[in-house]
Regions:
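Glycine-rich phosphate/adenosyl-contacting loop at the front of the ribokinase-like
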Residues: 1-59, 64-71, 75, 279-280
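Active-site-proximal loop->helix
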Residues: 64-78, 96, 105, 119-123, ...
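A glycine-rich helix N-cap at a beta->alpha junction
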Residues: 75-88
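Conserved phosphate-binding/catalytic loop of the ribokinase/pfkB sugar-kinase fold
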Residues: 85-86, 96-132, 137
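Conserved beta-alpha-beta core of the PfkB/ribokinase-like small-molecule kinase fold
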Residues: 132-198, 214-215
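Conserved phosphate-binding/catalytic region of the ribokinase-like
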Residues: 167-171, 194-296
Length: 296
């Protein structure tokens, strides 16, 4: 099975502190690092680490950061032939603060904003040859919706991780195979008048909601909800845990796993990813996930 990720490619500027600063507060940091990131690239790397045949579609700037990010994708086993280098704009950057088992993230889109309809049309023939397409919200939303429409027209399964949080039109929800928000994104998409449980019963086999320390839930039917609790972990850095879960879930679903098996696998992979520093640095291999599953 061939998987395609169309999404963001960033460099993450990461600062470590004792805790996340309050509004208007200045805190000393313990370290500064520049590491590969972007929700799209992260999810592609998560899949590749687990053994997936995955390609990245997106844009980087004509700068050192862009070249390094493409080299990193290739080094991790992600195909990058369709990653476009764009002159005159910087590679996307995420500014991350890590502290007290939590993080904050501010993203500057840069070249990710150039993943537009013209770019998609230029790679469409190749893109439509994949068995599953995975999307996020760090590229222009009209591009995301355009790709969902294309995949729907060609009967290609498409997974939308709607992060950062933004509204998702009802017709897009109907067309995606899976929608994977966290609990905060779910409120923005569906409103506050329905609980997560009610939403999961409304969209069985389509909606997956991550709920932080309470685990991850999915509706198996309108009558049955599966919640997989968080695996205990010695947390070092939660950055990228959601991307690891999404990447692992997509890979295992594409490989034919049941929803329950895919979710347990993905939840375990996400937990393992928090035990090392950086979004991609902690992403586990298939062997590591299988070992952890046996120990549960």
């Amino acid at each position: 099975m061939k998987l395609a990720v169309v999404g963001s490619i960033n460099i993450d500027q990461t600062v470590i502190a004792d805790r996340i600063p309050h509004k208007g507060e200045t805190l000393p940091g313990h370290g500064l690092s520049y590491i590969p990131g972007g929700k799209g690239a992260n999810q592609a790397v998560a899949m590749a680490r687990l053994g997936a045949d995955v390609a990245m579609f997106g844009c980087v700037g004509d700068d050192d950061n862009g070249r390094k990010m493409v080299e990193n994708l290739i080094a991790n086993g992600v195909k990058a032939d369709q990653v476009r280098t764009v002159k005159g704009v910087p590679t996307g950057i995420a500014i991350i603060t890590i502290g007290d088992n939590d993080n904050t993230i501010i993203v500057v889109a840069g070249a990710n904003s150039k993943v537009d309809r013209a770019y998609v049309d230029s790679v469409k023939e190749d893109l439509l040859g994949y068995d599953m397409v995975v999307l996020q919200h760090e590229i222009p939303l009209d591009t995301v919706h355009y790709i969902v429409d294309l995949c729907s027209e060609h009967n290609i399964p498409v997974v939308l991780n709607p992060a950062p949080a933004a509204a998702v039109p009802a017709e897009i929800i109907e067309k995606v195979t899976w929608l994977t928000p966290n609990e905060h994104e779910a409120v923005l998409i569906f409103g506050e008048d329905k609980t997560a449980e009610e939403l999961l019963r409304m969209y069985p086999g389509k909606l997956l909601i991550t709920q932080g320390s309470r685990g991850v839930s999915v509706g198996l039917s309108s009558e049955e909800i599966l919640t997989v609790p968080v695996r205990p972990a010695k947390v070092v850095d939660t950055t990228g845990a959601g991307d690891t879960l999404n990447g692992a879930f997509c890979y295992r679903i594409a490989m034919g796993d049941s929803v329950e098996d895919a979710l347990r696998y993905a939840n375990t992979a996400a937990s393992l990813s928090t035990e090392k520093f950086s979004a991609q640095g902690g992403m586990p291999t298939a062997e590591e996930v299988e070992k952890a599953l046996k120990e549960l």
